Amino acid sequence: PIQLNPAPDGSAVNGTSSAETNLEALQKKLEELELDEQQRKRLEAFLTQKQKVGELKDDDFEKISELGAGNGGVVFKVSHKPSGLIMARKLIHLEIKPAIRNQIIRELQVLHECNSPYIVGFYGAFYSDGEISICMEHMDGGSLDQVLKKAGRIPEQILGKVSIAVIKGLTYLREKHKIMHRDVKPSNILVNSRGEIKLCDFGVSGQLIDSMANSFVGTRSYMSPERLQGTHYSVQSDIWSMGLSLVEMAIGRYPIPPPDSKELELMFGCPVEGDSPVTETSPRQRAPGRPMSSYGSDSRPPMAIFELLDYIVNEPPPKLPNGVFGSEFQDFVNKCLIKNPAERADLKQLMIHAFIKRSEAEEVDFAGWLCSTIGLNQPSTPTHAAGV
């Protein structure tokens, strides 16, 4: 069961009544986090803005555009008219009794306490007209699955910065809130033009997870072998999902079943040491619902979902091809994708891995790369190196 901090008293859904007293307590909590000056300023600015928001009501929002759908809900970019803030509003349609609905809203209040540079900011949650609304900070770069579509593949140096943010985000959720994410995948890693990388859509409400259990099927392809087998799973399961996501973003396609040497050559434009096609007996090359790869060589039908799940549980884990990626990156991913969760690296071990140490030391203009890749204007703030 998910451990939750007791919900704040008072059913004022957005917790505004106690907002003023909370700000000082929050600032105290921020001091405990190891933040640099810029991160601290940005979090404080977010919390100050949030104070102006007041109680969230359906009438106060104006729809701007749809940002995406999935995970049982639709996300819109909205304007919150009273405060003038741009937010992302996720709407989840649920046919549930009022008591359950109230419990979900209550459990979501924990999100008010999730304040970290690696976690998407939360404005509040409320219920109206058969839908639960979760209002979050708008991340103008979208999710990494959207970025991947534009980029084709994401460079190793960029994935180094992504790995740091995901590990730090998962560590924060675990250490400060005793929760695991449960749904790490490229579409739940959001980025923005300031170069920030944040996790969203983590399992904070046990009741919401239960109520949405039937709509979770599409996510299973990122689940760890132990989770697919229904055995006990922990934050180690999130590490598998992160490893799988990194391989996908590095090679430009969902990595199960693995590409053979012919497909790798088409991907990277040169002969690459891949597996000799072990899966020759099974003429399938794509995960369910995945478009045909743009390389054109792939005329095989997609794997059925049960075949895919069987593959994850029974076949060797995916890995990065040799000769294209650094050995530290390969080793990092291999340690995330060990099938036995007890042998898989944990968050502490990953944080001191050579790949992470190198990535931390590297000067990478993440914001510049993102903006040029997806065609966003970079904000002209002093947060970027001159001449970028």
Curated annotation (Swiss-Prot):
* Catalytic residues (positions): D183 (proton acceptor)
Q: Could you say which EC number(s) this protein's record lists?
A: 2.7.12.2
What processes does the entry annotate via GO biological process terms? regulation of early endosome to late endosome transport; regulation of Golgi inheritance; regulation of stress-activated MAPK cascade
Primary enzyme class: transferase
Spell out the post-translational modification annotation for this entry. MAPKK is itself dependent on Ser/Thr phosphorylation for activity catalyzed by MAP kinase kinase kinases (RAF or MEKK1).
Which compartment or compartments is the protein found in?
Answer: Cytoplasm, Cytoskeleton, Microtubule organizing center, Centrosome; Cytoplasm, Cytoskeleton, Microtubule organizing center, Spindle pole body; Cytoplasm; Nucleus
Pfam families in alphabetical order: Pkinase
Question: Known CDD domains for this protein?
Answer: PKc_MEK1
UniProt: ATP binding residues? L67, G68, A69, G70, N71, G72, G73, V74, V75, K90
Q: Give a GO cellular-component term.
A: mitochondrion
> Where does the record place the modification Phosphoserine?
S211, S215
Annotated stretches, region: Disordered? 1-20, 275-299
Question: Domain Protein kinase: where?
Answer: 61-356
Catalyzed reactions per annotation: L-seryl-[protein] + ATP = O-phospho-L-seryl-[protein] + ADP + H(+); L-threonyl-[protein] + ATP = O-phospho-L-threonyl-[protein] + ADP + H(+); L-tyrosyl-[protein] + ATP = O-phospho-L-tyrosyl-[protein] + ADP + H(+)
Can you provide one Gene Ontology molecular function annotated for this UniProt record?
protein tyrosine kinase activity
Q: Which UniProt keywords apply?
A: ATP-binding, Cytoplasm, Cytoskeleton, Kinase, Nucleotide-binding, Nucleus, Phosphoprotein, Serine/threonine-protein kinase, Transferase, Tyrosine-protein kinase
Q: Which Gene3D superfamilies match?
A: Phosphorylase Kinase, domain 1 (3.30.200.20), Transferase(Phosphotransferase) domain 1 (1.10.510.10)
Primary subcellular site in the record, as a coarse category: cytoplasm
Q: Could you confirm whether the keyword Glycosyltransferase appears in this record?
A: no
- Its family? Belongs to the protein kinase superfamily. STE Ser/Thr protein kinase family. MAP kinase kinase subfamily.
What does this protein's UniProt record list under function?
Answer: Dual specificity protein kinase which acts as an essential component of the MAP kinase signal transduction pathway. Binding of extracellular ligands such as growth factors, cytokines and hormones to their cell-surface receptors activates RAS and this initiates RAF1 activation. RAF1 then further activates the dual-specificity protein kinases MAP2K1/MEK1 and MAP2K2/MEK2.
Protein name (record): Dual specificity mitogen-activated protein kinase kinase 1
Say which species the protein is native to.
Serinus canaria (Island canary)
List the gene name: MAP2K1
